[in-house]
UniProtKB/Swiss-Prot annotation:
Required co-factors: [4Fe-4S] cluster
Protein name according to UniProt: NADH-quinone oxidoreductase subunit B
Free-text function comment from the UniProt entry: NDH-1 shuttles electrons from NADH, via FMN and iron-sulfur (Fe-S) centers, to quinones in the respiratory chain. The immediate electron acceptor for the enzyme in this species is believed to be a menaquinone. Couples the redox reaction to proton translocation (for every two electrons transferred, four hydrogen ions are translocated across the cytoplasmic membrane), and thus conserves the redox energy in a proton gradient.
Similarity remark: Belongs to the complex I 20 kDa subunit family.
Organism: Nocardia farcinica (strain IFM 10152)
């Protein structure tokens, strides 16, 4: 994000990291990636009854270059997976991903060749939100959990190492379609 990449590891004090995290968690700009019925609940969260604006997220961004949170709401097909990855790569650092619903988290009831069995095989996921579809209150709770994670995320070199490790673990995981046992 600029200065923090140029600082050597361990240079910042923890209080400075906490303060930067506190400021970051209040200015999260989500990019919508609504693919199925979970997107309806995500839109309801932005309405007046649930008021996501109190967390500083009233404007959902249409451009990934203006967003730092991707909410993947719904199932991801094999043809949509490269598009999802491209949108993720275009987002500015630091960036976070929230998998909304069981379809985004694990493929849901669509356990076939055409659906990615969990969006974490394409991009690293920070928060998993269960439900089919999850209620807006659950999305708000997941956003609060993400705020806590953002506040305690390291800066600089430590952040880059953590992101690389999460991406390698996600891409090295066995796809659910190849697993045996209760899933098949």
């Amino acid at each position: 994000m600029g200065l923090e990449e140029k600082l050597p590891s361990g240079f910042l004090l923890s209080t400075v990291e906490s303060f930067a995290g506190y400021l970051r968690k209040g200015s999260v700009w989500p990019a919508t990636f609504g693919l199925a019925c979970c997107a309806i609940e995500m839109m309801a969260t932005g309405a007046g009854r649930f008021d996501i604006a109190r967390f500083g997220m009233e404007a959902f961004r249409a451009s990934p270059r203006q967003a730092d949170l991707m909410i993947v709401a719904g199932r991801v097909s094999q043809k949509m997976a490269p598009v999802l990855r491209q949108v993720y790569d275009q987002m500015a650092e630091p960036k976070w991903v929230l998998a909304m619903g069981v379809c985004a988290s694990s493929g849901g009831m669509f356990n076939n060749y055409a659906v990615v069995q969990g969006v974490d095989h394409v991009v690293p996921v920070d928060i998993y939100l269960p439900g089919c579809p999850p209620r807006p209150e659950m999305l708000l709770n997941a956003i609060l959990a993400l705020h806590d994670k953002i506040q305690h995320t390291p800066l600089g070199v430590n952040r880059q190492e953590a992101v690389r490790a999460a991406e390698q673990a996600a891409l090295a995981a066995t796809p659910t379609i190849r697993m045996e046992g209760l899933l098949r």
